[in-house]
Amino acid sequence: MRKLLVCLIGLLPIFLISTVQAQTVVRLDPALDKIVPPNAQVEKLAGGLGRIEGPLWVRDGGYLLFSDLNAIKQWTPGKGVSVYHDRTFSGPAPEGTRVGTNGLVFDSEGRLIACEHGNRRIARWERNSSVTVLADRFENKRFNSPNDLVRKRNGDVYFTDPQYFEDLKIPDPDKVFQTDMDYSGVYRVTAGGKVELLIKDLARPNGIAFSPDEKKLYVANTRPRKFWRVYDVNADGSLLNGKELLDVTSLPEEGVPDGMKVDTAGNLYATGPGGVLVISPQGKHLGTILIPEIAANCAWGDADGKTLYVTARTGLYRIRLNVAGVRP
């Protein structure tokens, strides 16, 4: 009996490790139980990709688009991953470098608008396959490396423009990626084509999202401090009263504040340390959906908008939730 007890005690750590490894959600507040079902599981849909970002669900076709290095890929239920567009950077670039598109969104006519990281611009892809540049500079200086974007219902596009090429250390003998600006910015391109600088005091602005009523704008900052900031949106589209929503610099898990989306109740689904953090409109961290790789962005998908798709380094994941998301 004693030997059996010793054996069982010896096996206990194994059982505990298996339980931790199988954990899908860290629940920090009872409010999360209404959002994430008790039996919810993170499902891996694809792996072995390059460095994926910018997921966007195509409702008409029932598939997901996402950026992958210098291409846009497509994931279709029952078919898997295929190439949607094989080259999104117009210049030469070493294999495996992140110079293609990043954030993706549709306009009111269903045309794709993209943050073109390497081309340093915001561009709209027309139905005849031509490209219309919506913005590529401010005050005659080229953007740094447009990262993520969100479209307001009136047609205005808000986007982040961090100085990331310094971090990527891409070979650049012709100084193609040399920045003209001494700051990272958040901008708006109005429906009429005017470019406006809204924020310039964030070190590395990244993900960006509106509240459901578009009266608040959320912006992620990746480093050196890891936090999300929230702004009031004036009737004219300008921003004011910026304040910190949540700081996660002290969290030990891998990952930084990156892409994010909101649900119809106003909760924020923000990729960051450990996976996707669920944050209330008041800035309370309700819990984290754990992702096996460093999560970069997320998007609402499926017919009912209750599936959250997550791009994470080389893998594509999803999880079914009880709530529907706000979709462009």
Where do the protein language model's features map onto the residues?
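Positively charged n-region of N-terminal signal peptides that target proteins for export
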Residues: 1-4
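Bacterial N-terminal signal peptides
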Residues: 6-18
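Sequence-structural signature of mature extracellular/luminal beta-sheet repeat domains
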Residues: 21-328
